[in-house]
Amino acid sequence: MWNALKRLPLFPPSPKEDKQLRKERLHWRNMCPSLTETVTALFIHEKPTKGFRALGTGRFMSAFVAVFFNMGLSQKTRPVQLFGYILPLFLKPFVCTVVTTDVYDKDGRFVESKFEEIFNKHARTHKDALTAKEIKQMLKTNREPYDFIGWLSDFIEWKILHTLAQDNGLLTEDAVRGVYDGSLFQQLEKKRSSSSSRGKKQKLP
């Protein structure tokens, strides 16, 4: 996320820019509300907390991640450098970013070959999936020197992703791809909603 913020243009799509880039930027801007339950151009802790709860994380973890997320991005996205105890995060000035593994080019376009490189380089046990140990090694390999906040951010992002999307301890290529196109979040939310519905039915006399 931190590397992605440094790399992606922090402006809304322009009518004059490349059509493909404009399409992708609009895609991410449209995906942000569904992930964080954003109602306006800004959201506070309560919104991402609900969003992570919808994905299946516990109450404590949802609250922790939401505060960490807002603390890291609030100052970067505010139009003016003002202190805000609720740490508001403004979506308008930037393209929504996802887990960073350098799969974008300098213009913010998704590069398929770079995505596949993740598994070609780091998937040792299974060619189309990553184990927790392989993810840890990947993060260590991709570290930027002295970027301690970035290390922590990347570790938390991948740890949560592995916890929520792993299948028998494996994070599949399809699951990781789902992060970039937004489909994984919808799948996790539907899965949790379905589980909740079944639980309620079982409790009925």
Swiss-Prot record:
Map motif Proline-knot onto the chain.
79-88
Which Cys-Cys disulfides exist here?
A: none
Highest taxon listed in the record's lineage: Eukaryota
Lineage start: Eukaryota, Viridiplantae, Streptophyta, Embryophyta, Tracheophyta
Name the chain's protein: Probable inactive peroxygenase-like protein
| GO cellular component term, pick one | lipid droplet
Q: Which InterPro entries would you find in this protein's record? A: Caleosin-related (IPR007736)
Location of the protein in the cell: Lipid droplet
Source species, please?
Arabidopsis thaliana (Mouse-ear cress)
